[in-house]
Amino acid sequence: MAPSKPAATAAKRTAGSNTLPDPATLDTLEAIERKALWLSSWLIHNANHIRPSRDGLKVGGHQASCASAVTLLTALYMNVLKPEDRVAVKPHASPVFHAIQYLFGRQTRDQLERFRSLGGAQSYPSRTKDSDDVDFSTGSVGLGVGATLFAAMVRDYVRLHGLAGEGEPNGRIVALMGDAELDEGNVFEALLEGWKHDVRNLWWVIDYNRQSLDGVVHDYLFQRIKDFFGTVGWNVIELKYGKLLQTAFEEPGGGALMNWIDTCSNQLYSALTFQGGAAWRSHLKTDLGRTKGIKALLDDHDDDALHRLMTNLGGHDMTATLEAFNTVADDTPQCFVAYTIKGYNTPLAGHKDNHSGLMNLEQMA
């Protein structure tokens, strides 16, 4: 559920305008983002490594899937959403949702400590079993996404037939979805129904980390997404590069760097993300070493800085994310394709087996 008016004052919201938060507010949002990442990771860590267990079996959880969605959910809940908005959170990001609700004071520590156990916070958002403000149950991938479209149409029907409360604002319906949810047929059935009935005030935010339980996503999926959604009248916004990369593209050799990233396969990009700065440097030297400006770029960045630059995707850059969200000016359905990294800012980032991977005690310390 969207923040109530008192809770939302933690970060000044500018939804529906072309302005961005001031630097102090942006710092606050990024601090909240870090808290949400640690707390969501800890929920899963506690359930698997700390909480007493009778049988010692793995409880499970998806730390990498949470990490890819933290920036997007922080931006939405702490800056963009209004009280009348409703949200479906992708199943595997349930710990991030619970962490944010805890920061709002709507979730208890006891519930977090009992995550994935009887009576505790649920593995996937549940309206019937969770104690915090879940708007849509999203336990089976794809179902929550489709439900948001029909909810938007029902909300329109209620208003058009004079059944809404007097003065009740017409909020948005938002789905934060995983890219693998586009494998579900009901999502495309819903899209067609929305086109038939002129759905409005609907946002689908795709956490485009390009990794799933089944493997690395096809390299050309984005173009298919753009085609599918454009055909049924949606506005498609590609949120691909963060501000660090955007700045680098303006420097000598920047065009070649952007082309290299654009043509880099999802599989190679994930592998380099896991391997780190030295691996990025080696590949860039091999492929672009003779390109004017690239040597200077590499010399100006140590391995850590180069890794930060090359992984500065739009879905992890708070400023770029807020620019995309806060510049929507009308009620046309919006599809945000937010490029992210599965496991971002954790040791799991980019690893081929990170879908159900768990950080160990040393990595969580």
Predicted regions and their residues:
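Generic start-of-chain signal for non-secretory N-termini
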Residues: 1-41
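Long, well-ordered, tryptophan-enriched scaffold segments
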Residues: 18-22, 208-365
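Cofactor-binding active-site loop characterized by glycine-rich and histidine/acidic residues
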Residues: 24-36, 40, 44-52, 63-197, ...
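Generic beta-sheet signal
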Residues: 85-87, 171-173, 202, 332-340
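Short internal beta-strands
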Residues: 87-90, 201-209
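Active-site flanking residues adjacent to catalytic metal/cofactor-binding acidic residues
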Residues: 177-180, 206-207, 338
